[in-house]
Every structure is written in C-alpha cells, then in structure tokens.
C-alpha cells in the first residue's frame, strides 16, 4: 500500500469537521496567526511560509507539505472541497461541483472519503487524480460573456487582481520555466478551467509542480499591489496549477482520473445527535427545493440575482 497523504487546508477561525483516516492530513492554514490550542497540525513548523497565508491562501499548506512531509502521493483539498471517490455521478452546480449542505458521516460514506482501501486502489492506478474541468464561460465575473479561459480570468481584473497580472505571469513563465510556456498559451486559449487547487499526484509530479509554482508566485508578490489585491498570488497559483496539469496531460501524456469535486456549504462540527438529524432533514428539504428553483432561477442568471435582492 502506497503512502498517500491528502493535505486538507483548514481555517484557523472555524472548527471544521475532519475525515479521520490515515490518508487525510488536516493542516491549519496560516497557523502562525492562530492563538488557540488546536490539536490540528499547523503550517508554521519546519520550513514554512505560514505568514503569507493572506496572499498565498491554501498554498501555504501545499508548501509545508512539500518541505516537511515525505509521501508517495501528495494531495491537496480544502476544508469545504473534497474529491469524490464514488463511482456514481451526481448532479453538478454551475461551477461543476457537487453541492452538499454539511460534511457528516453520511456524506463521508456517500463519497467514500472514509474508505482508505478504495482510495489507495484508485490513486495507485494513475499519475494524477484531478477534478473534472469546468466551462470557463460559466465562471466569469458577473456572468460576462467569455469564450476562453483567458477571457474568464480577465473578467476578474480589478476584482481579484490588478490589470496586467496575467501578462506578468506569462512573462515570468517564459523567464523562469520556459518549457511550460506553450502549454500555458494553449491552456489559456481553451474553453475549460481546472479550478480550486484540489488534486492528488505522484511525488515526482508534486515536487515539479511546486518548483514551477512558488518561484513565480513569489515574484508576483514582489511586483503586484497586494495591499489592494491581497490574494492575487493565490489566484496566480491556481492558474499555474491548471497550466501544470495541462502540460502533464498533453505533453507528457501522464495518466489521470477525473473525478467530481464536492463542495460542502458548512463544515462546522456537529456536536449532538439532534443536530445531526436536523442537518439531514435540512439537506433533504434543500435538495427538493433546489430541484425546482434552479430550473426557474438558473445559477447567476439576471432573474436569480433580482430575486436575491428582494
């Protein structure tokens, strides 16, 4: 059995549910700022960049894993986003994620998050486990009409980052990692987005991705207005993650399994049986209402936005 570690980036201000198996490794993101006595491992030990949490987001956890943990496979998930290991296909949201209200024992079983043997069997067959792609046209800011991934990201100019940051990223790729430049151009000219920084990779690929991402993210932080756009380096990291995966698939022909990404609206711990069953009833009711409402008021449609303002 391979040593597989999926690092789950946790917020320091929320006591989130964890998946307690040998595979999942919860880590507090930005733990250097945490004044609590949490038992969850922090990203502030050993070689770390924990203090950059506000700009690098979950990448401080990725960096910590790279520098401080030895494994055969490295994965990254988010306290509200997990890769599904179920063979069943579930209905997606506009961002091509499955939506669940809570993370409970029921959901862990449903998506086989608690099945260590199953996860091992799946992961060892591939170089990478990655989320299914999302259409760039469905992820633009304010539902702006876009055709390419570049146009999608540029719709966030002045929202998530300053104008010109994408050009800066391309220049840095050409300077620091020119072997990825053509793949970057091809990926950004395409119609699909590999979003949310969730994946599992063989150690070799994980190390190569880190060596690709962090030098560019560090330079972006040096030349970008991070006071206004604090999380800009993190968004660049997400773009670089997609570029790296695209390169591995199209240039090196690496094997990959695409699986659904599950988004949990609320992952705060449930402390009683009464609260658990209340959540289950709420989840069933929410699904029933959405099955009707989403057809009448599609996600991010002008009609839906007007109703939300009432």
PLM-predicted stretches and their roles:
Residues 1-310:
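ER/Golgi luminal nucleotide-sugar-dependent glycosyltransferases, focusing on the catalytic module
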